[in-house]
């Protein structure tokens, strides 16, 4: 939990209707300009890409796509990217809620969770990069699920856990849930030029564990 909002910044959490909320999850917004706010994108002459990235969700209000909660003490919890939120059984889950639990295990270096369309719903798929020499045994999978269930809810527990050799990231170092989700659904990934290691996407393609009957 962050102890406080950015000093001098009009940071709030808004629900889907644009109402300010506290004690519940929503979109992180900033109602007024702030010193570190970018003023545009390179080669975006009419500003359309810039506006679409930050001002399309709530017209005129900065919203960069973080799923967050303002706590009763005035702190802030970030749950991950709002466009990567999982929705099994209609329950919205931030991916960071899962990562915090999984990466407590010494065997796990890092992880990425995505939602896979499944039987008129969405199932949670967790992909883990393990330390050298570690295998994803049934026992390790059960420990991962137990750790998640103990500290979150049964809805957070992944239906499938698979091991991957690498996890794709942007050039700035952020993992890319949306690109991985597109790959496991057989969709084209739009902007691989933004990835530092686009070859890592191949570890998620046509996985037999994720085959839809």
Predicted segments with their positions:
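Conserved ATP/PPi-binding loop(s) of AMP-dependent carboxylate-activating enzymes
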Residues: 4-8, 17-55, 93, 188-189, ...
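Acidic, glycine/GT-rich loop-and beta-edge segments that sit at the periphery of enzyme/chaperone cores
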Residues: 5-8, 204-213
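Conserved beta-strand and immediately adjacent loop positions that scaffold enzyme active sites
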Residues: 10-11, 27, 75, 172
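General small-molecule cofactor/ligand-binding pocket signal
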Residues: 12, 161-164
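Flexible glycine-/small-residue-rich
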Residues: 13-15, 30-32, 128-130
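Glycine-rich, charged/polar anion/phosphate-binding loops
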Residues: 14-17, 110-112
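AMP-binding/adenylate-forming catalytic core of the ANL superfamily
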Residues: 34, 39, 48-52, 60, ...
């Amino acid at each position: 939990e962050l102890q406080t909002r950015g000093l001098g910044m009009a940071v709030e959490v808004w629900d889907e209707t644009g109402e300010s909320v506290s004690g519940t999850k929503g979109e992180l917004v900033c109602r007024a300009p702030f010193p570190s706010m970018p003023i545009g994108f390179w080669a975006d002459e009419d500003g359309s890409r810039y506006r679409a990235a930050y001002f399309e969700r709530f017209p005129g209000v900065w919203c960069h796509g973080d799923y967050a909660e303002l706590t009763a003490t005035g702190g802030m919890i970030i749950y991950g990217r709002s466009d990567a939120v999982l929705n099994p059984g209609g329950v919205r889950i931030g991916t960071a809620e899962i990562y915090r639990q999984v990466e407590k295990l010494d065997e796990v270096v890092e992880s990425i969770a995505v939602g896979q369309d499944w039987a008129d719903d969405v199932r949670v798929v967790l992909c883990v990069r393990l330390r050298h020499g570690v295998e994803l045994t049934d026992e390790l999978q059960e420990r991962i699920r137990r750790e998640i269930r103990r500290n979150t809810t049964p809805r957070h527990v992944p239906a499938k856990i698979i091991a991957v050799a690498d996890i794709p990231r942007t050039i700035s170092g952020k993992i890319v849930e949306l690109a991985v989700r597109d790959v496991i659904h057989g969709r084209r990934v739009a902007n691989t030029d933004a990835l530092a290691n686009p070859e890592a996407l191949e570890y998620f393609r046509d996985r037999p564990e994720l085959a839809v009957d």
